Regions:
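Charged, cofactor-coupling segments
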Residues: 1-110
């Protein structure tokens, strides 16, 4: 698709939902993408104006079987572990014992 000109006039506002979709694609083979939905919420307000941030609104573990920890940076591991901790804290109170055991395994720290 050809885009005649860039349009930067759009803006994110409180309550808008978007997705975060990191992925990898191997040309001519396949691709894989992990998707989470995020909501735009108010953050800090200062002399420069109202800042916004994103909060997760979907809480599903990322499949650790598809991850090679040795290829991740320390920051990437920290982000994944923090996300899985949040998934555990949000979801586990609503699960029975068997379901909690499953979630514990799939949100384990790497």
């Amino acid at each position: 698709r050809v885009v005649a000109e860039r349009n930067d006039s759009g803006r994110l506002e409180e309550g808008m939902i978007t997705t975060d979709e990191p992925g990898v694609y191997l040309e001519g083979e396949y691709g894989i993408r992990t998707e989470n939905e995020l909501i735009c919420v108010k953050a800090e307000k200062n002399e420069y104006g109202q800042f916004m941030k994103f909060e997760n609104i979907t809480y599903a573990p990322i499949d650790l079987d598809g991850i090679v920890p040795e290829e991740m940076t320390g920051r990437e591991k920290k982000l994944l572990n923090a996300y899985h901790k949040m998934v555990w804290e949000k979801i586990s109170p609503y699960l029975n014992d068997d379901e909690r055991e499953w979630l514990k395994e799939y949100t384990r720290e790497i």
